[in-house]
Amino acid sequence: QPMRKGPDAAFSTEVANAVVMDSGRPVLFVPYIGAGKTLGERILIAWKDSRESARAVADALPFLKDAKAVLAIAVEPRDEESVQDYVSDKAVEGFLRRHDVDATVNRMVAPDIASGEFLLSRAADFGADLIVMGGYSRPRLSRLVWGGVSNLMLESMTVPVLMSH
């Protein structure tokens, strides 16, 4: 997890961004508090119908196949501008089924709180010891500007997060 404060804070965020965006590999971020006693037994998938989410789920298959419980959450946006980013949760459900991953897939309307905070809350409620998600950047802006959920997860994660781009 990047440093939140101090002279290295900006550098840490820049490095985290570059690693996810440019490595071509999944990246496992571990929170300041470290990983818990387990890793990958209870996995929450933050699903958005995008290349990044699909890549993250595919990259996480070794964890997903061995998990005791998997919960995929597809958050449906409230505002009309975001509707084009949302497609049915059936894509992730079908993929997981084809790979013999027993998962519960929930579609939820975006709550009034930020999506990242909502996902962290659901992860805590579920007892997740790993979150799987796509790493996003905002198109045509500085590579240092991450999407809101990706950035919030890096800053506030309470369990390890596997990100892919």
Regions found by a protein language model. Name each.
Residues 10, 50-51, 86, 113, ...:
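Conserved phosphate-coordination/catalytic loops
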Residues 49-101, 106:
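Redox- and metal-dependent alpha/beta enzyme cores, enriched for Fe-S-associated oxidoreductases
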Residues 12-16, 86-90, 119-121, 145-150:
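Charged helix-capping and loop-helix junction motifs
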Residues 40-41, 56, 81-86, 116-118, ...:
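Short, well-ordered secondary-structure micro-motifs
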